[in-house]
Amino acid sequence: MMSRRAHPTRLLRVVAAMALAIGMVAGVAACSVIGGDSSVPVATAKAPTGTDGAVDFDGRFLTVGSGPKHLDLWFDPMCPVCGAFEKANGKTIDAAVRDDTITLRLHPLTFLDRSSNGTAYSTRAVAALTCVGVRHPNSVLAYYESLFAHQPEEGSDGLTDKQLAALATDLGLTDIGGCIDRSGPYQAWAQANTAASQSGPITVDGRKVLDRIEGTPTVLIDGKQFTGSVDDAAAFRALLAKN
């Protein structure tokens, strides 16, 4: 009788799934910036400066809400653990923004460009989010949530530019397709954010909080890092209420 042999691709998928599960149980950011600077895309255009709409180009984040507590979230649009965090805690964050409990600052990174078969999905998705931030500042959180509701698998091509534009249209926003087509500077900004996250230090409200971003999601509430499991909604709510 011939023995059944696992296909190498299938084995890799199993190992990846196990690593993700272990990372979530351990409460770590499993989407690690492996390779340091080698994982950082090189910007090919000049990044914008100043502020425009909800985007603080100098601060390297998009702002949502105006509450007294500051929630800083570093994420990569293709990171599956970021998706797990959003699934577990997205409604809590949304509610905290709506009732003016927090100011959410989204810090987009693009190191998983390496995992989208050459399509630079993370960079393109961040550029699309930036288009929304500039043109529709009140819809940043809705578009961010839509990116994760339609999150592609790590290792896939990701969404096309037309699909990224359609996510905005589905929210009732005017077409951002043209903005995405001309998003070279926004892509450069996204890539510069990633480089800065590795060179460090990471500062929040003028004080150092981390040497560098080791992985995503990285979540801080008023400068205090959430170290629980990404899918532990109760622990996240407790930290949010405490600070």
Descriptions of predicted regions:
Residues 83-163:
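Structural alpha/beta surface segment adjacent to cysteine/selenocysteine redox centers
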Residues 74-76, 107-110, 147-148, 222-224, ...:
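Active-site-proximal beta-strand/loop segments in catalytic clefts of secreted hydrolases
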Residues 54, 164-166:
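Polar alpha-helical coiled-coil and adjacent low-complexity
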Residues 2-7, 34-43, 170-243:
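C-terminal cap of thioredoxin/glutaredoxin-like
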Residues 2-117, 197, 205-206, 239-243:
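Extracytoplasmic thiol/disulfide redox context detector
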Residues 79, 130, 148-152, 173-181:
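A broad detector of the eukaryotic-type serine/threonine protein kinase catalytic domain
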